[in-house]
């Protein structure tokens, strides 16, 4: 959200990544409705990291399918062992078709803050307004301190 953007910029970042947030927009027509609803209903604790043992970690929605991937990794599975269940095809089965039993969906840590499916324009308008309010607040604090 706008607060996260403002905080990142204040810490010196050039920008932020908003992949999960953009999935939950009206313009994201390729994401299955089940995927979007899972994003809306998820809490911060509803994601896990898969493919860590392969040196290519990625955060996904927690499900029986993704928990199975982690168990196989813990048991020492190689890339070849996991290839069919970590492939782009497995990802597509969920994000396009809504097949949670045979696929997975990427999801960022911000997932618990997503609670609507706006248009991209609405999303940006809200973020910009939040950033502007935050900047005004900071300006007021600085102004007050310089007059002490």
Where are these regions (language model features)?
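Conserved active-site-proximal phosphate/metal-binding subdomains
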Residues: 2-148
